[in-house]
Amino acid sequence: MILSEIGGGVLAQTVANQIFIIFLLIGLGFFIRKIKLINDGFTQGATNLIIYVTLPAMVLASMDRDFTRELALNGLIIFLLGGLMYAILSIIAFIFVKVRKINDDSKGVYLYMIIFGNVGYLGYPIMSIAFGEIGVFYAAFFNIWFNILTWTLGVKLMSKDRVSITKLLLNPGLLATLLGVVIFFLSIDLPSTVKTTLEMIGNTTVPLAMFVIGAFLADAKFSSTVKNKELYMASLMKLIVGPLLMVIILFSVELSSTIKAIPIVMSGMPSGVNTAIFARMFNRDYKLASQGVVLSTALSLITLPLLLMIIL
């Protein structure tokens, strides 16, 4: 269901219901981790399952639809708006590290933290909850940028290593999106058994992802994080300044409310888990990166509902 097409009172109730569902799922994940019903092995395994299996299945299922010029044009617009978002966040990030005089050892972490949000792991489930399958369809076009930039610009920010073309091309999110685009533009009808299987697998993404985020927050050590004001300011840039600039720009142009809403919501996603993964991979400040991801994720439980209520 596309929220922007619902009447005022029903819209407000629908948004409230979806936000409540998110809180319930994350809260349940937090609780079952605290009582040790799940362990680190489960959360790591679930993370891999989401990245390599359920998210690609969700994307492919959403792309199996009849080709229309309207959908294709909207997908192209969403793709271009994704580029705009990354340009805006990059400018914000570089201004931030310059004004705050961030040291060279931490600069790459802060830049990555602000530029790259959790647009896949959290973004797709939020799009599914808020907009239904069409939200996932459009988000796939939007996330082409992430899948390319994270293995090009992202690697450059965290390391002096050369960009790995192999890792770029074997990225499961990019592969699923490109295959889905081919399926859509060539109007390939997947067999009903395949489509149903993809849908069933993809439908597990939302609860799994929310559980893992809840478990992630349950394991977080906030004592040292709360003392770092730079992390708060970086989270402010990521969760508030970036989305507000997108709101100002997009609400000044003539586009459907859904096409406006998707890039704005995606711009408000917290720092991606890849921030910590890349920091560890390239011997950067892993502790700082982890604290940034935890803090922005925790704060997004406040900012994302507010953002959804403002724009939908």
Language model feature labels by segment:
Residues M1-L312:
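Alpha-helical transmembrane segments of multi-pass small-molecule/ion transporters
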